[in-house]
């Protein structure tokens, strides 16, 4: 019985703390998420076939050939 009361009080305190901090942080988000069109345009930014793909941060539209370090398109079926 004593343990149950302690657990109930702990849950109530944690819930109250979350509600208080949620109210305080309303409207103070610094970095808002990107719009879906921006996400799509960034996700489709890749290097074309024939481009060097050694130590770049961008990825190939197809795949990077290991020995030639060139981007190659996927074969069409």
UniProtKB/Swiss-Prot annotation:
Domain writeup: The presence of a 'disulfide through disulfide knot' structurally defines this protein as a knottin.
Family listed: Belongs to the conotoxin O1 superfamily.
Organism phylogeny: Eukaryota, Metazoa, Spiralia, Lophotrochozoa, Mollusca
Propeptide boundaries: 23-42
Family annotation (InterPro entries): Conotoxin, Conotoxin_omega-typ_CS
Alphabetized UniProt keyword annotations: Calcium channel impairing toxin, Disulfide bond, Ion channel impairing toxin, Knottin, Neurotoxin, Presynaptic neurotoxin, Secreted, Signal, Toxin, Voltage-gated calcium channel impairing toxin
Disulfide bonds: 46-61, 53-64, 60-71
Record-given protein name: Omega-conotoxin-like SO-5
Cellular component terms (Gene Ontology): extracellular region; host cell presynaptic membrane
Subcellular location: Secreted
Residues annotated as signal peptide: 1-22
Known tissue expression: Expressed by the venom duct.
PROSITE patterns: OMEGA_CONOTOXIN
Domain of life: Eukaryota
Role according to the record: Omega-conotoxins act at presynaptic membranes, they bind and block voltage-gated calcium channels (Cav).
A Pfam family assignment: Conotoxin
MF terms (GO), sorted A to Z: calcium channel regulator activity; ion channel inhibitor activity; toxin activity
């Amino acid at each position: 019985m004593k343990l149950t009361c302690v657990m109930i009080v702990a849950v109530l305190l944690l819930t109250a703390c979350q509600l208080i901090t949620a109210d305080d942080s309303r409207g103070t988000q610094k970095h808002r998420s990107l719009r879906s069109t921006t996400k799509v345009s960034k996700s489709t930014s890749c290097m074309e076939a024939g481009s060097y793909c050694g130590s770049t941060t961008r990825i190939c539209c197809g795949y990077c050939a290991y020995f030639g370090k060139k981007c190659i398109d996927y074969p069409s079926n």
